[in-house]
């Protein structure tokens, strides 16, 4: 037993995980990410566009400054903190800027080097702040971000960024959510985890989300349907959601409900993942299903049917949000028709 314990990484012994009876969350969600957590995750990613020795960001020479070695994560983190404090940016701006940096790598065929990362970060942050605020700002409004950077240079930098991005500055809700969860996964892979606390009622109310419940009395059974969705600041439509039939249904109508989903054009499939009502938490659901295959303004649908079998069946798929109400009506109609036929 002692040998088995020593084989476990020490950081896993210190971590706490959520369970059915205990929910442990940090202060970060996709719609309202925590600033410090986002910057620490973001500090591992930095790209380049301008040569800093040719166009130095500070005019004076800094002692001990080297352009031959990659900057440490703490160095990048301190630079981000200073930049965010001066410009007064929020955590979503960092995620949007990371999207722009990734697009620069693809479209402009540029690479990361220790001499250039500050200029690329500054340019993407300024562009992301203007796009995020959603109104035209003059470069002089953000000129206080660096006392050694002239407004003319900032304007040229912004113009160059837009040209390299091919003016593709739109960030959809699905792309925003994907980068958010990619940052969370990256932090977890590098053992950069944060303190979790118990989910209390006041903390749950602060999470930006919307839940709607529907209850129907259908013959001898009561069918409960719940739609749990979060909203991204980039879109007014639901980004993620869950549809759950959490009450007991007869075994005979499981195939009928599955056929309703197929007729509705929802590509359903059986999955071994079972989300029971007691652990149907927002964070657990998003981490498992939000990264792969998420489309803009789509809803992640999960239908769980409890029948006579010992294990419930679960169906999941992506579909456009306007179809949610229609899907609820179709499933409800199938249940009503089933019980109406039983009474005849």
From Swiss-Prot:
Can you supply one Gene Ontology CC term for this chain's record? Answer: plasma membrane
Q: Which CDD domains match?
A: CYCLIN_CCNY_like
- Alphabetized Gene3D superfamilies for the sequence: Cyclin-like
Domain of life (superkingdom): Eukaryota
Q: Where is the Cyclin N-terminal domain?
A: 40-170
| GO process terms (BP) | regulation of canonical Wnt signaling pathway
Family in the record = Belongs to the cyclin family. Cyclin Y subfamily.
Q: Which protein is depicted?
A: Putative cyclin-Y-like protein 3
Specify the species.
Homo sapiens (Human)
- Upper lineage: Eukaryota, Metazoa, Chordata, Craniata, Vertebrata
């Amino acid at each position: 037993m002692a040998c088995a314990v020593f084989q476990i990484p020490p950081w896993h012994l210190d971590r706490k995980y959520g369970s059915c009876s205990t929910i442990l969350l940090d202060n970060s969600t996709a719609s309202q990410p925590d600033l410090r957590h986002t910057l620490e995750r973001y500090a591992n990613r930095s790209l380049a566009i301008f040569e800093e020795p040719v166009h130095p960001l500070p005019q004076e020479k800094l002692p001990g400054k080297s352009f031959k070695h990659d900057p440490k994560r703490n160095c990048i983190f301190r630079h981000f903190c200073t930049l965010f404090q001066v410009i007064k940016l929020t955590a979503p701006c960092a995620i949007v800027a990371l999207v722009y940096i990734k697009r620069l790598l693809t479209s402009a065929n540029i690479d990361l080097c220790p001499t250039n990362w500050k200029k690329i970060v500054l340019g993407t942050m300024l562009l992301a702040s203007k796009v995020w605020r959603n109104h035209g700002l003059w470069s002089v409004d953000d000129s206080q971000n660096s006392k050694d950077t002239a407004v003319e240079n900032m304007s040229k930098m912004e113009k160059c960024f837009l040209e390299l991005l091919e003016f593709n500055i739109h960030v959809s809700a699905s792309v925003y959510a994907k980068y958010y969860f990619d940052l969370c996964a990256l932090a977890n892979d590098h053992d950069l985890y944060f303190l979790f606390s118990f989910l209390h009622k006041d903390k749950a109310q602060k999470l930006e989300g919307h839940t709607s419940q529907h209850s129907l009395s259908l013959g001898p059974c009561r069918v409960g349907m719940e739609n749990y969705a979060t909203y991204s600041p980039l879109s007014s439509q639901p980004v993620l959601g869950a549809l759950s039939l959490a009450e007991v249904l007869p075994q005979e109508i499981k195939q009928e409900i599955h056929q309703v989903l197929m007729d509705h054009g929802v590509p359903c499939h059986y999955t071994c993942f079972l989300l029971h009502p007691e652990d149907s938490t927002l964070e657990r659901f998003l981490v498992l299903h939000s990264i792969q295959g998420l489309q803009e303004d789509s809803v992640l649908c999960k239908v769980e049917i409890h029948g006579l079998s010992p294990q419930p069946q679960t169906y999941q798929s992506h579909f456009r949000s306007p179809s949610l109400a229609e899907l609820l009506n179709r499933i409800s109609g199938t249940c009503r028709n089933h019980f109406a036929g039983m009474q005849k």
